[in-house]
């Protein structure tokens, strides 16, 4: 393999994919590759893909067509498609897209240098085997900036929700050693990072391979290892979130008071068909426990409109749930069949597309009203905001987030991204709060 070949990664999808791209970059750098700033400067272009939502292949199809043209001009250019899409739709990759030289699933990144080497010999190659032990222990991600960092604490999912493709693209659950996670958190704190997010398809299922320690124990250990760093986590499953975890959040001041708890539907019958393993009464009890233990906590969720067999009364139950819980934010989608899932194999996709879209819009409209009202209640208060970046829409202002994950835009003054700032909130929309600086709590040491 020629020394110093340049690679460029384009990442699609979730936070886990962002973390995986950092792992991919580290593997290639350690093998002697160099990073390219743009696709045009690269010898190897890697697309790290997500298969969770509808039309995952179509999202990369246009880019692959562009790369097909680029390969005619640059004969040695190699293109690899990585992540969940090739793991889920392997047959389609090579047959439909001649630009692709190699594909690799989420458990194969350690072997990318040899895969690229094979593809350089004009052999289209694939590495898609699941590795039930692979958690990329010992590989430190390449990270952009020094404000926020992701640490994947576990990979895969055992829940087998009927609509979800994750168990088929990322395999069964396996966890990072607790000592490795806390050690990485400590390193990030010493390097000056302000925020760490612990990632997993279902973090509540975390189990230390050596001791069996739970996620609440891991979260507590990370909070102690990085006491001056904000600690977040995602994603939780309602049936698995524990009182012990909630108590840990309440006990440690640097664990953010924000819980993302996907409910998917407000109907018990739909939840049963989804194979979620809980009902609405159990979900509402978890919400009550969270709010009792964490005054002022912000809550977000996921909603799917138009799942198989959903009736109008099921849809109304979802709207009622939104009114009851009054989430601060929600990720909302209409159902689309994902090949290979339990729903695709056993349930008819029998809700009309027009009904799916109408129901989704009604959910969005209601949630925007609720989010707007929740944000209005924050106006007049003072919040601690971690400045993250320049505001794209408001020159001279910074965008940051509160402990509760509310987005805040405020006048920059002498502040910079990474500063922790006290901001008086003066106005709001359904998505964003605006305010004026009242003081600097802690400056970012660049």
From Swiss-Prot:
Residues 5-121 form the MTTase N-terminal domain. [4Fe-4S] cluster 2 binds at residues 157, 161, 164. Keywords: 4Fe-4S, Cytoplasm, Iron, Iron-sulfur, Metal-binding, S-adenosyl-L-methionine, Transferase, tRNA processing. InterPro entries: Elp3/MiaA/NifB-like_rSAM (IPR006638), Methylthiotransferase (IPR005839), Methylthiotransferase_CS (IPR020612), Methylthiotransferase_N (IPR013848), Methylthiotransferase_N_sf (IPR038135), MiaB_methiolase (IPR006463), rSAM (IPR007197), rSAM_horseshoe (IPR023404). Pfam families: Radical_SAM, TRAM, UPF0004. Binds 2 [4Fe-4S] clusters. One cluster is coordinated with 3 cysteines and an exchangeable S-adenosyl-L-methionine. It is found in: Cytoplasm. Residues 376-439 form the TRAM domain. Its main location: cytoplasm. Its cofactor is [4Fe-4S] cluster. Gene3D superfamilies: Methylthiotransferase, N-terminal domain, tm_1862 like domain. GO terms for cellular component: cytosol. Its EC number is 2.8.4.3. The keyword Nuclease does not apply. [4Fe-4S] cluster 1 binds at residues 14, 50, 84. GO terms for molecular function: 4 iron, 4 sulfur cluster binding; metal ion binding; N6-isopentenyladenosine methylthiotransferase activity. It catalyses: N(6)-dimethylallyladenosine(37) in tRNA + (sulfur carrier)-SH + AH2 + 2 S-adenosyl-L-methionine = 2-methylsulfanyl-N(6)-dimethylallyladenosine(37) in tRNA + (sulfur carrier)-H + 5'-deoxyadenosine + L-methionine + A + S-adenosyl-L-homocysteine + 2 H(+). Residues 143-373 form the Radical SAM core domain. Belongs to the methylthiotransferase family. MiaB subfamily. NCBIfam families: miaB-methiolase, MiaB/RimO family radical SAM methylthiotransferase. Monomer. Catalyzes the methylthiolation of N6-(dimethylallyl)adenosine (i(6)A), leading to the formation of 2-methylthio-N6-(dimethylallyl)adenosine (ms(2)i(6)A) at position 37 in tRNAs that read codons beginning with uridine. HAMAP family: tRNA_metthiotr_MiaB. This is tRNA-2-methylthio-N(6)-dimethylallyladenosine synthase. It comes from Chlorobium luteolum (strain DSM 273 / BCRC 81028 / 2530). The gene is miaB.
């Amino acid at each position: 393999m020629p020394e110093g070949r340049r690679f460029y990664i384009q990442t699609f999808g979730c936070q886990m994919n962002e973390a995986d791209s950092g792992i991919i970059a580290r593997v290639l750098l350690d093998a002697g590759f160099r990073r390219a700033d743009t696709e045009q400067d690269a010898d190897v272009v890697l697309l790290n893909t997500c298969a969770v939502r509808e039309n995952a292949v179509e999202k990369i199809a246009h880019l692959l067509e562009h790369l097909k043209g680029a390969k005619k001009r640059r004969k040695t250019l190699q293109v690899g498609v990585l992540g969940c899409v090739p793991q889920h739709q392997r047959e389609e990759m090579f047959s439909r897209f001649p630009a692709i030289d190699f594909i690799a699933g989420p458990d194969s990144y350690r072997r990318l240098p040899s895969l690229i080497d094979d593809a350089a010999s004009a052999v289209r190659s694939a590495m898609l085997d699941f590795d039930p032990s692979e958690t990329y222990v010992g590989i430190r991600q390449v990270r952009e900036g020094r404000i926020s960092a992701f640490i994947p604490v576990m990979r895969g999912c055992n829940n087998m929700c009927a609509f979800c493709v994750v168990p088929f693209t990322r395999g069964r659950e396996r966890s990072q050693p607790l000592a490795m996670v806390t050690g990485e958190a400590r390193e990030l704190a010493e390097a000056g990072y302000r925020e760490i997010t612990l990632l997993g398809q279902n973090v509540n299922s975390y189990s230390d391979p050596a001791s069996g320690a739970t996620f609440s124990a891991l979260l507590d250990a990370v909070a102690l290892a990085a006491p001056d760093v904000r600690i977040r986590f995602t994603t939780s499953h309602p049936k698995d979130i524990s009182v012990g975890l909630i108590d840990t959040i309440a006990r440690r001041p640097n664990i953010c008071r924000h819980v993302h708890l996907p409910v998917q539907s407000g109907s018990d019958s739909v939840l049963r068909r989804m194979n979620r393993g809980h009902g609405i009464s159990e979900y509402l009890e978890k919400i009550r426990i969270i709010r009792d233990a964490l005054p002022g906590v912000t809550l977000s969720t996921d909603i799917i409109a138009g799942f198989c067999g959903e009736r109008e009364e099921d849809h109304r139950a979802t709207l009622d749930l939104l009114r009851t819980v009054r989430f601060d934010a929600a990720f909302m989608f209409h159902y689309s069949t994902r090949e290979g899932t339990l729903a695709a194999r056993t349930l008819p996709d029998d809700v009309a597309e027009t009904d799916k879209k109408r129901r989704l819009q009604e959910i969005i409209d209601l949630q925007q009203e609720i989010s707007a009202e929740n944000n209005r209640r924050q106006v007049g208060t003072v919040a601690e905001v971690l400045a993250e970046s320049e505001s794209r829409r408001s020159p001279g202002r910074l965008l940051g987030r509160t402990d509760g994950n509310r987005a805040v835009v405020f006048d920059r003054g002498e502040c910079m991204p990474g500063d922790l700032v006290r901001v008086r909130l003066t106005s709001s929309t359904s998505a964003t709060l605006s305010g004026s600086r009242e003081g600097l709590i802690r400056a970012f040491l660049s």
